Amino acid sequence: MAGLRQIAFYGKGGIGKSTTSQNTLAALVEMGQKILIVGCDPKADSTRLILNAKAQDTVLSLAAEAGSVEDLELEDVLKIGYRGIKCVESGGPEPGVGCAGRGVITSINFLEENGAYEDVDYVSYDVLGDVVCGGFAMPIRENKAQEIYIVMSGEMMALYAANNIAKGILKYAHSGGVRLGGLICNERQTDRELDLAEALAKRLNSQLIHFVPRDNIVQHAELRRQTVIEYAPASAQAAEYRKLAQKVHENGGKGTIPTPITMEELEQMLLDFGIMKTEEQQLAELAAKEAAKAAAAVH
């Protein structure tokens, strides 16, 4: 266990968190690291590209079939994927029933008790980040994940979620050893995206670990249920993920305690960058449009 790096990828739904994490981990395994992935997202897609398969059976669904978690063996839930990466999905309940975070808690305890954490260099948690409720905060709260990487973009909701996740990290940073490893910007090609990502990282007392450019090759690889590292190892995008993996690898012990900002400060930042408009600007634009329309109608 000495030297075990427990990292987690958080980010809002649909941000490309699972894609980014799996490509990063595929690049890390190429560097000779032994890896265990624990998927903590109810979608159970945190290991799909590593296993080249549809979503794997989750600990919760297998436990329900077997009777209880105690009735499971480690080999029932742990699958081996690309270059020996160990994969587990914790799963979640039926929509509208129970707490999705409960599966995370149940899974991590089961894995630890059954020796899944032995003989690995990295344990990576892939966690839904829109809701920092008790269950999803579990890897942070229980002092499991030590380094949190927030996957975000220049879109307002992604920035909002990143700031919220930073609040969750701050809450547990003093009682446990959890730190913010940094932000990973998954390019959405919004205005001034790199500047905004770097500015937010600075405000959060952190760093932008890497800016991942947008490339359709990611979708081509996903359709084949593969990471870009496996599908197109010589591509420019694979090189980007390798750079990201190298930066994560060299970032051990360099995490910080975040300084989240208020909603007002976040909105002010978006205004300063011209991403968001004031009500006056919006009204002026609307008035200009109406005037142009009226002028066109006259002619």
UniProtKB/Swiss-Prot annotation:
CDD domains attached to this UniProt entry: NifH
Annotated signal peptide: none
Biological process (GO), any one: nitrogen fixation
GO MF annotations, alphabetized: 4 iron, 4 sulfur cluster binding; ATP binding; metal ion binding; nitrogenase activity
EC number: 1.18.6.1
Record's keyword terms, sorted: 4Fe-4S, ADP-ribosylation, ATP-binding, Iron, Iron-sulfur, Metal-binding, Nitrogen fixation, Nucleotide-binding, Oxidoreductase
Family annotation (SUPFAM superfamilies): P-loop containing nucleoside triphosphate hydrolases
Cofactor note as given: Binds 1 [4Fe-4S] cluster per dimer.
Superkingdom of origin: Bacteria
Protein residues bound to ATP: 11-18
Function: The key enzymatic reactions in nitrogen fixation are catalyzed by the nitrogenase complex, which has 2 components: the iron protein and the molybdenum-iron protein.
Family to which the UniProt record says this protein belongs: Belongs to the NifH/BchL/ChlL family.
Subunit structure: Homodimer.
Protein name as it appears in the record: Nitrogenase iron protein
Organism: Methylobacterium sp. (strain 4-46)
Gene giving rise to this polypeptide: nifH
